[in-house]
Design a protein with these regions (language model features):
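Short acidic-glycine-tyrosine-enriched beta hairpin
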Residues: 80-96
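Short, conserved beta-strand element in jelly-roll/cupin
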Residues: 47-51, 61-76, 114-117
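Short, surface-exposed secondary-structure boundary micro-motifs
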Residues: 96-97, 116
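Asparagine-centered strand-capping/turn motif at beta-strand->loop junctions
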Residues: 103-104
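A short hydrophobic beta-strand segment most commonly corresponding to one strand
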Residues: 47, 107-124
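A short, N-terminal "cap"/entry segment at the start of jelly-roll beta-barrel domains
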Residues: 1-42, 125-126
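Conserved short histidine dyad/triad with adjacent acidic residue
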Residues: 30-31, 46-61, 95
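Structural motif
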Residues: 73-75, 82, 98, 108
Length: 126
């Protein structure tokens, strides 16, 4: 047993977290799985779903994003390159780097996205 002082452990059941539409892109939804309101001191973990035919416009974020693809096959544009991603792929999108998403397939795409807690300024590009 440890004498370390820190946050209490949390187990968040996926079906207990409601997904909400994301205003910036039709067909994109987000569920916040863990963040500072749950006692997570450093990072927020979110689950995104990208519906078939959905596109997220080019944008930048003030904070880095680490992503892990759960389902589907879709395109992620990062900088000047496009990448087709599928389950098991992991991505690092550094702060300030332009990126976008496009799901041209028939199945939803889903990914986990981890970001630092705190404010994130999002700027649409173009």
């Amino acid at each position: 047993m440890s004498d370390a002082v820190g946050p209490d452990p949390v187990v968040q059941r996926g079906d207990a977290v409601a997904a909400e539409p994301v205003d910036a892109a039709e067909g994109l939804s987000k569920a916040v799985l863990l963040d500072e309101s749950d006692g997570a001191p450093n990072f927020a973990m979110r689950r995104f779903e990208l519906a078939p035919g959905a596109e997220v416009p080019r944008h930048t974020n003030a904070v880095e994003h680490e992503q892990y693809v759960l389902a589907g096959e879709y395109v992620v544009g990062i900088g000047d390159e496009e990448h087709v991603v599928s389950p098991g792929d992991a991505l690092l999108i550094p702060a300030g780097v332009e990126h976008w998403y496009r799901n041209a397939g028939d199945e939803p795409g889903a990914f986990i996205c981890v970001v630092p807690n705190g404010d994130d300024a999002i700027e649409l590009v173009g």
